């Protein structure tokens, strides 16, 4: 066991050979490396599997022994300065290592097929492997200096992957936006680290917390300064985990390839901010005002992320705002001091959201064959719909991830979110009401995504691309709700909708696809791969198709995680049955924070609390089903809903409220616009003023001196040309000047 911990230093360096070898291969043997590019997926996956096995072994030792291991090497520069590097192995390290490696392996397998036709395949795997190295180095760091180094490397990999398709201006701008926004938080983190070193003289986690607690207990430190240092450290987590007000970079980060959204922007990198707060929680917990601030930022982010997600049309940006909201729940739990619950939700959310992102990638992958490689179309949920029959496996996986995020038992996020809601009532009833309301809102926007994508009809074939109002059978509002259009008796597109029944693929069902749209076209629409155009020419009529097996494999494994990973944190005990493996793993850290690791509830209390949270989730699902139901839904036959819908359409106040909510959500809460006006525009004006001052004043003075010298030189050059007339003129001029001065002063 001791040897296992001593060998843990290899964890962050195991995936490193892949990007090095890819770089050397492209430099020395570019043709051979590119021809064998698919080969590089195997070592990337294999090396990460080794790290995963090592991490699981460490976790088993942690559960059995409940101890913390730290190994440090000191590099003495002189008698007054020495640098210490090492690694820290505790429960938090084990959890994060398993999370990074498991999700990373599945994303690498998924990416091998998803990125197979991309010219940047090798570059993608090099970036991804280097990101895994950086993230593993971050979670195993034993001091704040190492944390900051790997923190910046993680950010660099994120920027490279966000701007992976750098030839697209939108992706390049998103990369710059992520960089600038995170610079704010990272600068605060650096200042906080320097401030702590100035106070304590140490940056090692094993010494830092004890020194700070002693200084605070003995009143030997300025409480305002130590609070400022804590706030600056927290700024780094706010930016990295996309918390308000530094959240604006995360939705734009979806411009990168979808697999990296599953790994970086759902499971690992954005969780780095949560990890840092969890690592420094013994320090934060000594300053109650900082804990309250963490909880306050968390609850604001919870609400903001949920409200901004309810009207987005881009499926990935919808999931990005969902990630932002769920990270807010984790930050809220840490602010309340619920260390175990925050990490529990970090685990359950990582697998559920990775499943949703990979599912969205499968959907986008199938849509690209129809609408082209344009994110505005392939990721637009308004052009989807009716995908259940075309991508049934993806649909099932996406539904499971959706139910998990909504908090429906027995899926993973139900167990963790339910505990956060319960603890919020003990912390603050106001925060609890907001958190519970947002849980219902989460169910609403997640089922909105599901209904728009998988239910109804395939809207690409009915969407109006030409701007003509009468060219579609169905109109789709900005909210994504379908509404029937009245068809004229004479329809000139019937021949385009007539399908050939000879060449039908096995993926498609035999029943009519768009039956009963209208009596005039009731029997003419069926789903086939080819159609006859005016009876003479065949042209392909594409429909979405299921993804390849390698992509589906990763999704199915994540489905299993979403089903069963919640069992590790079940905290209720009955008749000696203890299922809370997570508390056993976290027992060293929980003892450090003076929390009771034996906290549990009985079955009755559990079912009482769960019934309330599940009822909220089902209410949100019901509202989403009402507003985004397909046009053929049997809910339309209910007199109560018809009556409500009729009254709602006549209510001007309700329309005003709904439109206001939509404008708020679709325009990102006007926060980006506010930053554009108050910060970006101001910086640009200042830059223009600085440019004017630099060119006209700083450069103007030496330029003026140079021009003046040039003119004087030219004048003397003309006078000294050798002409007698020039000399006489010059002599007369100075004689007259002398006489004028003489008579002015002396006479």
From Swiss-Prot:
GO cellular component labels: chloroplast thylakoid membrane
Subcellular location, principal: plastid
Root EC class: translocase
UniProt key word DNA-binding: no
Keywords: Chloroplast, Membrane, NAD, NADP, Plastid, Plastoquinone, Quinone, Thylakoid, Translocase, Transmembrane, Transmembrane helix, Transport
GO molecular function: NADH dehydrogenase (ubiquinone) activity; quinone binding
Transmembrane segments: 9-29, 40-60, 89-109, 125-145, 147-167, 185-205, 219-239, 258-278, 280-300, 327-347, 354-374, 396-416, 425-445, 552-572, 606-626, 727-747
Membrane topology field: Multi-pass membrane protein
Pfam families found in the cross-reference section: Proton_antipo_C (PF01010), Proton_antipo_M (PF00361), Proton_antipo_N (PF00662)
UniProt keyword annotation of NAD present: yes
Xref: InterPro entries: NADH_UbQ_OxRdtase_chlpt_su5_C, NADHpl_OxRdtase_5_subgr, ND/Mrp_TM, NU5C-like, Proton_antipo_N
Coiled-coil regions listed: none
Gene3D superfamilies, A to Z: 1.20.5.2700
Gene Ontology terms: biological process: ATP synthesis coupled electron transport; electron transport coupled proton transport
Superkingdom of the source species: Eukaryota
Cell compartment(s), UniProt: Plastid, Chloroplast thylakoid membrane
EC number per UniProt: 7.1.1.-
Catalytic reaction annotation: a plastoquinone + NADH + (n+1) H(+)(in) = a plastoquinol + NAD(+) + n H(+)(out); a plastoquinone + NADPH + (n+1) H(+)(in) = a plastoquinol + NADP(+) + n H(+)(out)
Assembly and binders: NDH is composed of at least 16 different subunits, 5 of which are encoded in the nucleus.
Family in the record: Belongs to the complex I subunit 5 family.
Stated role: NDH shuttles electrons from NAD(P)H:plastoquinone, via FMN and iron-sulfur (Fe-S) centers, to quinones in the photosynthetic chain and possibly in a chloroplast respiratory chain. The immediate electron acceptor for the enzyme in this species is believed to be plastoquinone. Couples the redox reaction to proton translocation, and thus conserves the redox energy in a proton gradient.
Protein name per Swiss-Prot or TrEMBL: NAD(P)H-quinone oxidoreductase subunit 5, chloroplastic
UniProt organism field: Lotus japonicus
Organismal lineage: Eukaryota, Viridiplantae, Streptophyta, Embryophyta, Tracheophyta
Gene expressing this chain: ndhF
